[in-house]
Amino acid sequence: MDMRSHEMIERRREDNGNNNGGVVISNIISTNIDDNCNGNNNNTRVSCNSQTLDHHQSKSPSSFSISAAAKPTVRYRECLKNHAASVGGSVHDGCGEFMPSGEEGTIEALRCAACDCHRNFHRKEMDGVGSSDLISHHRHHHYHHNQYGGGGGRRPPPPNMMLNPLMLPPPPNYQPIHHHKYGMSPPGGGGMVTPMSVAYGGGGGGAESSSEDLNLYGQSSGEGAGAAAGQMAFSMSSSKKRFRTKFTTDQKERMMDFAEKLGWRMNKQDEEELKRFCGEIGVKRQVFKVWMHNNKNNAKKPPTPTTTL
């Protein structure tokens, strides 16, 4: 078998006025095949059409499949601004959709013509994504962020996901705190007695203050103004009447004379005499101390002079 091949390659460059001219490559292949076995002469001529390659026009197939993404449509719906946030409430103006006050690109375009609020206070909607989709997406992202970790600070939830603190119910195990130290009644069946009730006790009449008045007054003053204020506030809400000790006329006269003898104050050197006196008239020491505290101002007042004509 005898084969002859002749190949001629001609290259020609043409300048068509462009910065980068095209390259024309023409390949002409002529092949003559002699088949002596069959006795046939087959002449085959293969001609390749000329192809113009321009690297500016040739692009990879992947570049044609990638198209520029269209700009998403953004709309601003109802206004979510809470006008009572400073006082802990929840008040909305009822604006249903953002309406720019000016032309696009100006500062006035960022303010709503209906509610006069900034555009950021309105709910943002992109390509028809509603608030329910945004909530589900936020929950899904928040779950994966907590499960697998994520950098940066935690983003706040959408405004429609925020809860009003005034609408939260109290804890199920919540019980009011009772101040047993000041709220317990004495064994005798009386109610709670406060320093304020001592101040309003008064000096005259047949009913006087009991010994528990001054005892509580001394405790509250010793523990500070904070404990006294809390105890008085709790006592004002109590509906029980406080216990009062009644004195006879003879007891009041003898207590008046003995208080003037002591100078309306209890000194340490008079402690023995004070115990003996309280045992004689049948009055407790604390009861006498409270009575003296309530009546010393009235007893020290000088008598009003009488004018004679």
Curated annotation (Swiss-Prot):
Tissue: Mostly expressed in flowers and inflorescence.
Subcellular location(s) of the protein: Nucleus
Disruption phenotype annotation: Increased resistance to abscisic acid (ABA) in the seed germination and primary root growth.
Site (Required for DNA-binding): residue numbering on this chain: 292
Positions annotated as zinc finger (ZF-HD dimerization-type): 76-125
Example GO molecular function: zinc ion binding
Keywords: Abscisic acid signaling pathway, DNA-binding, Homeobox, Metal-binding, Nucleus, Transcription, Transcription regulation, Zinc, Zinc-finger
Segments for region (Disordered): 1-21
Record's compositionally biased regions (Basic and acidic residues): 1-16
UniProt-listed NCBIfam families: homeo_ZF_HD, ZF_HD_prot_N
Subunit and interaction comment: Homo- and heterodimer with other ZFHD proteins. Interacts with MIF1, MIF2 and MIF3; these interactions prevent nuclear localization and DNA-binding to inhibit transcription regulation activity. Binds to ZHD1, ZHD2, ZHD4, ZHD10 and ZHD11.
Record-given protein name: Zinc-finger homeodomain protein 5
Organismal lineage: Eukaryota, Viridiplantae, Streptophyta, Embryophyta, Tracheophyta
